[in-house]
Amino acid sequence: MKIEQIYTGCLAQGAYYITSGGEAAIIDPLRETQPYIERLKKDGVQLKYIFETHFHADFVSGHLDLSRKTNASIVYGPTAQTEFDAIIAEDQQIFEIGDVKIKVLHTPGHTLESSCYLLIDESGNETALFSGDTLFLGDVGRPDLAQKSADMTQNELAGLLYESLYHKILPLADEITVYPAHGAGSACGKNMQKETLDTLGNQKKTNYALNQKDKESFIKEVTDGLLPPPAYFGMNVMMNKKGYDSFDEVLSQGLQPLVPEQFEEIAEVSGALILDVRSNGRFAEGFIPQSVNIGLDGDFAPWVGALIVDVNQPILLVTEKGEEEEAVTRLSRVGFDKVLGFLEGGFDAWKKSGKETDAVHRISPEQFEKEIHQKEVKIIDIRRESEYNAEHIHEAYSKPLAYINEWLHTIEPEEHFYMHCGSGYRSTMAASILQARGYRNFTEIEGGFRAISLTSIPKSDFVCQTKILK
């Protein structure tokens, strides 16, 4: 028997590859199937089952393409309703993979169909729990995402989650290894640890949600402080339920090279968003007017989903050479399949063709320090609220990037302001969106709060240990 965790850091997502006796199972695969196909060929095994822990909201799963290519059966937990062929398992149902077994544990709460998969090894021992979004390390699945489809309140769903965890998961043996669907950085929870596997025994001791005195306390704790989910979550659920275009077709279309003249014409005719995925430093130096920057070198896919409102938005890509396929792939993981092509030769080709360019006005933290001592200034901090609360510049306003589509309308076009994030990754995103919407009355601070913290600019007292995120 072999268990392999295939962890994708930029999505904070874990898929699982299990083999035994010439057969295999994959749990919660990502959109692109090639990594799994390669493993199956290398190991000389037949994929028998594709297990889904629930209808994912934060990414589009690869279950359909993988099933088409391997003839493996797709398995969901009880109550799931799909528009494609799938086994809708019963609670406690057993599936055999070679010499091992997987038992379905129906654990509603995060969603109604949410299920965990308990692995029973060749000796009959319960050894691993693939817990999906029911149980994370340090947290549990948020109970607010399925309110509409379940016709239940988040408190009612949280009550179901309590029953699932306390009656089905906690009685399991301490030595069982927990393999969750997500880790720190995912929007599917609020308090996840950076580790990607742990023993159930340790989680029983350390996970706040597993140590509540009663159901009421549990409901209060798990619903407190939940931020609104990204807009793309609902569409991803629908794609996972109903189906989607083949990833191979999406990739083929997205990898169409376009010379500057073609690129410009298609942008005008289609109304495509020009998405520049270069680093924030490269983008700030020069870019195509109206383009939006979300760098591949950060949490690319989640920010795409948070900032681009419509998953059906046509997209044209500007990339560094050789990063075209990576960009199309990562867009498809969150359901953005309408990539029309990429700028052949990148931004350099655009410049050489003599076409109009733009740039972001940036200054160093040292220059910023001089300027704030010379005049009264307005400062906008676009980090997450938790980062702002931990430590921030005196008099800075908190306006998180995730909500820029709401707060940018409150900006006075004639009032100048300075803007920063944690490192420069997010503030350049914000700068690109602001300039695309016609706002030019701001200055971005290079290096973000990390760099600012090295100056003598007055700051609030440090309140708690907070990871400064990109």
Predicted regions and their residues:
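Active-site metal-binding motif and surrounding structural segment of the metallo-beta-lactamase
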Residues: 33-75
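Conserved beta-strand hairpin/beta-sheet module of binuclear metal-dependent hydrolase folds
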Residues: 1-46, 117-132, 137-138
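Active-site neighborhood of phospho(di)ester-bond hydrolases with catalytic His/Asp-centered motifs
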Residues: 26-27, 47-56, 74-79, 106-109, ...
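Active-site metal-binding loops of divalent metal-dependent hydrolases
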Residues: 29-30, 55, 79, 111, ...
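Divalent metal-coordination and catalytic microenvironments
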Residues: 18, 28, 54, 66, ...
